[in-house]
Regions:
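Generic "edge-of-domain/loop-turn" microfeature
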Residues: 6, 15, 19, 24, ...
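Residues in and immediately flanking transmembrane alpha helices
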Residues: 19-20, 78, 203, 291
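Sec-dependent N-terminal signal peptides of Gram-positive bacterial secreted proteins and lipoproteins
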Residues: 2-27, 384-402
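Active-site-adjacent loops and short helices of periplasmic peptidoglycan-processing enzymes
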Residues: 25-186, 190
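Juxtamembrane/transmembrane-helix boundary motifs in multi-pass membrane proteins
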Residues: 2, 102, 106, 110, ...
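Domain-terminus/edge residues, biased toward the C-terminal soluble/receptor-binding domains
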Residues: 152-153, 166-169, 173-414
Length: 414
């Protein structure tokens, strides 16, 4: 009886261990982010690797400044001089970050952008908004117009810095669209990937001690979150918005943008983003399915010469698919569609069909091209042979008929 009980206990423990391991693996792969909204998109493919509440409206806090910076870069030169107005620095509530700047101070657009995007200086945002849009209201109109152009459908901006306003909101997906657009601008990338920048001395401040340090610790070499593959881009925090972070990372052939809106703490926005990054690189890879020029299919062409009748169809472009590592390349089956009639003559490179791969929810398409020329078959020889055969047969028939023809009987004479 004791032996039987022991065996039962061992069996139960064994099953429990297996179940525990299974639950752990599932939890690791089923990513859930501790934030109000989160999103991971691989830029090159457009693959949505993860999303939670990505189309739910949230307050953006200082990630707003991404849009402010890109509008400034598109409407100004970095060397332009801007004068700081009284209104630009007098409308900032206490507790919000400032450079600081001084009334009447003349600064370059470049320095103001570094103050805006590294230290997250709210005074710099107002100064740039007045310079570019004529007023904060005018600049806000520009922001909303630009957001609409980029495809943002659930956003509305009323200021250039994200200082809380109930009518100032966005979504994780809309911020992805804005961030993706901004990261195509080399000047923008240079700024947001910089760890620190010293503002130049000015007419109102002669010292060179205003050091703007990036609030994004992923680009801080002394931070435990430092990652050399991260290219920026922006943090944001208000009481109402929570902790926000948009990050761009390039690694293993991936260009990934992650968005977190409303993380619980300042540190968790980084730790959760790091977990999101690890999830991508631990679970996804680029699979090279085909190289341009690979032979996909061999066909027989109608009305072609014997020498060129057999034709290889080659793929028009490389196909590299982002897919879950659980999916093997050899398991991916293509959908091939050829023209209804493929008849000679055919020119090398002529499109004869299409090929489509569906991998982990994404479609990858390419054309199928003729690898070489196909010559149309001529029928002169065949006709001559046919005529010759016909004449021979006709001659044989005539000869046979002559041989079997009965001689005419002579009439009897009486």
């Amino acid at each position: 009886m004791n032996k039987r009980i022991k065996k039962t206990i061992i069996a139960i423990l064994f099953i429990a261990i297996i179940m525990a391991n299974s639950i752990f693996v599932y939890a690791e792969n089923d990513l859930s982010v501790d934030a109000k909204a989160s999103l991971i998109i691989e830029e090159n493919s457009g693959k949505v690797i993860h999303e939670e509440n990505s189309n739910i409206q949230n307050y953006p806090a200082s990630v707003t400044k991404i849009l402010t910076a890109i509008l400034t870069l598109e409407n100004c030169e970095l060397t332009d001089t801007v004068t700081v107005s009284k209104t630009a620095i007098s409308n900032i509530p206490s507790g919000y970050v400032i450079a600081p700047l001084f009334i009447g101070e003349q600064m370059s657009v470049e320095d103001l952008l570094y103050a805006l995007m590294l230290k997250s200086a709210n005074d710099a945002a107002y100064v740039l908004a007045e310079h570019v849009g004529g007023s904060v209201e005018g600049f806000s109109e520009m922001m909303n117009k630009k957001a609409e152009e980029l495809g943002c459908k659930n956003s509305h901006f009323v200021n250039p810095n994200g200082i809380h306003n109930s009518d100032h909101y966005t979504t994780a997906y809309d911020m992805y669209l804005i961030a993706k657009y901004a990261m195509k601008n080399e000047k923008f990338v240079k700024i947001v990937s910089t760890y620190q920048h010293t503002l130049s001395a000015t007419n109102k401040y002669s010292k060179n001690d205003r050091i703007m340090k990036n609030t994004n610790t992923f680009v801080n070499p002394s931070s435990r979150f430092y990652d050399e593959n991260v290219k920026g881009i922006k943090t944001g925090t208000t009481l109402q918005a929570g902790n926000c972070l948009i990050t761009s990372i390039s690694k293993n052939g991936f260009d990934v943008i992650t968005v977190i809106l409303g993380a619980r703490t300042s540190e968790s926005k980084f730790s959760e983003t790091k977990r999101m990054m690890n999830y991508v690189f631990d679970n996804y890879e680029y699979t090279e399915i085909h190289k341009k020029g690979d032979v996909i299919k061999k066909i027989e062409v109608e009305k072609a010469t014997k020498e060129t009748k057999s034709l290889n169809l080659v793929i028009s472009d490389d196909i590299k698919a982002i897919n879950n590592i659980k999916i093997k390349a050899e398991e991916i089956e293509p959908e091939i569609n050829l023209r209804d009639e493929i008849i000679a003559p055919i020119s090398k490179g002529q499109e004869l069909g299409t090929i489509k791969y569906t991998v982990d929810g994404l479609e990858y398409n390419a054309k199928l091209l003729a690898e070489n020329d196909v010559i149309k078959k001529t029928y002169y020889v065949e006709i001559l042979i046919g005529v010759g055969v016909f004449l021979i047969i006709l001659g044989v028939i005539i000869i046979i008929k002559k041989r079997h023809r009965k001689p005419k009987e002579k009439k009897s004479e009486w």
